[in-house]
């Protein structure tokens, strides 16, 4: 994988397409098992309503927790050995773990494997780092926005496919099907992605303090990490109460599950439509403007969600919120590209992933705690307050440093 002067230049557009496919496959693989995770926990011997809820929450959250712990290590290894190698490691490792999950005999085995899944993950942040280091800087927003739609598309289609497969073949076979998808992702990455990378010895690697001092604006980068965390907190805080809130709004209807599923899915559809377009706009006017505007827009949409009277009103607001959310993470990633070098891109994107995983763990806990004490509607108001704080914090960080104009 070491570069050679006679090698043809890397076709970053082809790599973007293949990386998008890889993110789609891993997004689908992760979400395939989500619809029946509590059912599988029950099948492994957990009984009783309280115990089932507790174990379902633990096995769901532990993956993100261990991913947050492991991401910086894999990011450092990516900066030493190359990002393609990390993509291959992640896809193959997760595929093997999925097979073992399908063979689990008790809840403790399953819990350990869910933790191992988090430890071996990291496909998406390494795909982001790979594309960020290859794409022309003036196209970063569009490229990273487009790449983000891969994981979103997979996450949207995965639960539907997982539910159908579980109904048709049972729960355990879905894990083997998921493993097959990840192995396919491994081979697609192996044969179709090109990277010119000169391995770096451990002695030549920058240490943490040197990474921080090499950043153009360390305080801004930290604020971007915090923004990523709050984006995930805001998204996750609504997830535990959404179905119950829809049931409260819908009243006595027979298809609450279908309505809830539709309302849960519409933000992802909106993000698919908005991410590449707003990313391209960010390349033109600046990703910092897109970020602040999308954060303020999110606040203005979250507040009325606490006052809606029908599921249709909630669905419309969530669609608009999804359009704003589609711009947020690509804008953050583009700003990270602008404020760091290729030498440390793997670690910067992995740190960002760690903050994202922490948000994935804390968001649902926050939403559940608020709803238990103050009701469903309070969740939206508190979340709006958190996002508003982040908008002010981000604006204050960004206005201190004008984003440099970077040419090809």
From Swiss-Prot:
One of its GO terms (biological process) is response to antibiotic. Coiled coil: none annotated. Pfam families: MFS_1. It is a multi-pass membrane protein. The chain crosses the membrane at residues 16-36, 58-78, 92-112, 115-135, 146-166, 173-193, 224-244, 256-276, 290-310, 319-339, 378-398. Signal peptide: none annotated. GO terms for cellular component: plasma membrane. Keywords: Antibiotic resistance, Cell inner membrane, Cell membrane, Membrane, Transmembrane, Transmembrane helix, Transport. Its main location: membrane. One of its GO terms (molecular function) is transmembrane transporter activity. It comes from the Bacteria. It is found in: Cell inner membrane. The keyword Cell wall biogenesis/degradation does not apply. PANTHER family: MULTIDRUG RESISTANCE PROTEIN MDTG. Confers resistance to fosfomycin and deoxycholate. Belongs to the major facilitator superfamily. DHA1 family. MdtG (TC 2.A.1.2.20) subfamily. This is Multidrug resistance protein MdtG. The gene is mdtG.
